[in-house]
C-alpha cells in the first residue's frame, strides 16, 4: 500500500520541482520520468491502491498537481483515493489530523482482523 500527504505528484511538470530535477538529474527530461510518480503510473508502474490527503487551502497546491495524479490513475492500474480536505494547508496540523487515518488504512490492507 502507498499513501501520502500533499505530495508533489508530477515534479517534472511544475516549475520549482523541475528546476530541482534539472540540478540533480541533468537537463534530459526523459530521464526524469523514473522519479516522477505520475510518469511512473502512466508507464505502468503503479500501486494497486494509493491514498492521498491534500488540503484545499495549501499554498503550494498549484505546484503539487494532484489533478495530474488523479488523471493518471483513471487508466485503471491504480485505484486512487484523493481526499481534498477543506480549509487545510501544508503544515504539521494537517498531517497530524489525518495520520491516524493513514495508519488505519495501511493496517487494514496488512491485517484481516483490523
What are these regions (language model features)?
Residues 18-22, 99-101:
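Short, hinge-like loop/turn segments at secondary-structure boundaries
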Residues 1-4, 49-53, 81-84:
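Structural recognition of the beta-strand scaffold that forms the well-ordered cores
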Residues 3-13:
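Active-site nucleophile loop of the alpha/beta-hydrolase fold
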Residues 62-114:
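C-terminal catalytic histidine-bearing segment of alpha/beta-hydrolase fold enzymes
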Residues 8, 57-58, 89:
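Catalytic metal-binding/acid-base residues of hydrolase active sites
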Residues 12-15, 22-75:
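The feature captures the conserved acid-bearing segment of alpha/beta-hydrolase catalytic domains
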Amino acid at each position: 500500500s502507498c499513501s501520502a500527504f500533499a505530495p508533489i505528484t508530477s515534479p517534472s511538470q511544475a516549475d520549482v520541482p523541475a528546476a530541482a530535477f534539472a540540478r540533480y538529474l541533468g537537463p534530459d527530461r526523459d530521464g526524469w520520468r523514473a522519479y516522477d510518480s505520475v510518469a511512473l503510473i502512466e508507464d505502468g508502474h503503479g500501486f494497486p491502491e494509493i491514498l492521498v490527503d491534500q488540503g484545499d487551502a495549501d499554498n503550494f497546491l498549484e505546484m503539487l498537481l494532484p489533478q495530474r495524479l488523479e488523471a493518471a490513475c483513471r487508466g485503471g492500474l491504480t485505484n486512487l483515493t484523493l481526499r481534498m480536505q477543506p480549509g487545510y494547508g501544508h503544515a504539521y496540523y494537517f498531517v497530524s489530523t489525518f495520520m491516524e487515518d493513514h495508519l488505519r488504512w495501511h493496517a487494514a490492507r496488512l491485517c484481516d482482523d483490523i
